[in-house]
Curated annotation (Swiss-Prot):
Protein name (database record): Queuine tRNA-ribosyltransferase
Annotated source species: Halalkalibacterium halodurans (strain ATCC BAA-125 / DSM 18197 / FERM 7344 / JCM 9153 / C-125) (Bacillus halodurans)
Family from the record: Belongs to the queuine tRNA-ribosyltransferase family.
Record's cofactor remark: Binds 1 zinc ion per subunit.
Region named RNA binding: 249-255, 273-277
Pfam families: TGT
Cellular compartments per GO CC: cytosol
The keyword Transferase is annotated on this UniProt entry: yes
Active site: D94 (proton acceptor), D268 (nucleophile)
EC number: 2.4.2.29
Entry-linked InterPro entries: ArchSynthase1/Queuine_TRR, TGT, TGT-like_sf, tRNA_ribo_trans-like
GO biological processes: queuosine biosynthetic process; tRNA wobble guanine modification; tRNA-guanine transglycosylation
Residues that, per the record, bind Zn(2+): C306, C308, C311, H337
Amino acid sequence: MAAVTYELIKTCKQSGARLGKLHTPHGTIETPIFMPVGTLATVKTMSPEELKQLGAQIILSNTYHLWLRPGHDIVKEAGGLHEFMNWDRPILTDSGGFQVFSLSDLRTIEEEGVHFRNHLSGEKLFLSPEGAMEIQNALGSDIMMAFDECPPYPAERDYMRPSVERTSRWAERCLKAHKRPEDQALFGIIQGGEYEDLRRQSAQDITSLDFPGYAIGGVSVGEPKDVMNRVLEFTTPLLPANKPRYLMGVGSPDSLIDGAIRGIDMFDCVLPTRIARNGTCMTSNGRLVVRNAKYARDFRSLDENCDCHVCQTYTRAYIRHLVKCDETFGFRLTTYHNLYFLLKLMKDVRQAILDDRLLDFREEFFEQYGFNQPNAKNF
């Protein structure tokens, strides 16, 4: 039996969005779902206990960063990532490919893998599909990702075509190198940029390998949102309906809703935690930059429509004071709220799918959030 299986519960009659369950060795996940990012085996400023209070069903950790610090051998010796960080719910690890391509200016791509420099020390390193599998097998995540090439946006077709073909060959090597298929699921990644024919080629190549799940990569890399939505519209239908679909690196509220409408089941992004550390909060009425001076005497909650612990307990004025003084507690509060907001949003999305009204929900949410305004500020 596969380590991870997908169960389709319902398709929204109004939108085509999917309500489902993802069964993993560490529990069942309700989808569509947002996955908080715990890059270094921690979601910044949050404890595992708080993540459970927030409603986090699954988190993501980063292969590249854990390879460098503390080292996958140490995590393996601890009993795997779940034991190491005291998290007994599912974990997804990315392959490290995105970091190799985004953090290192000096890199050389060859058929065997990628030569690059450690972004911390400048040391020369090499990562191959086999190496990415070895690291993730040691980490022991429930879901692993194949090692892929992550092209920039925009990229010319002449660059993208051989990149897609290389990603397909690397996917085959990942499958062969994967040592724990009975308790770790390996997902394949569809690439191809904004080119429909290359996305189709990539989807055909990758789905022919019969992975237990599929990700759409190469989005949220600087392209306009209408380009991303168009890519989803012609890529998602190419993926098997009985397997989970994961949109990598996407986490703004509008993109989560629009992704679900286009058949996506899983999302991850550093956005809610990163902007929280800048004093920016997601609220039902739009973006709120709590460090701004106008909140110095504002004794309301961050979001009067939110029932999270932070909004029930602390004021904008207090949180602004903490953030302005660089107090860690302030960043803990903004992070807690932002994660709660997105996880509650996905819960509402699931309910809207169940009620066959996701398009209506989108319209209501966008109107209240301000996305329908001509000069709407997104993240």
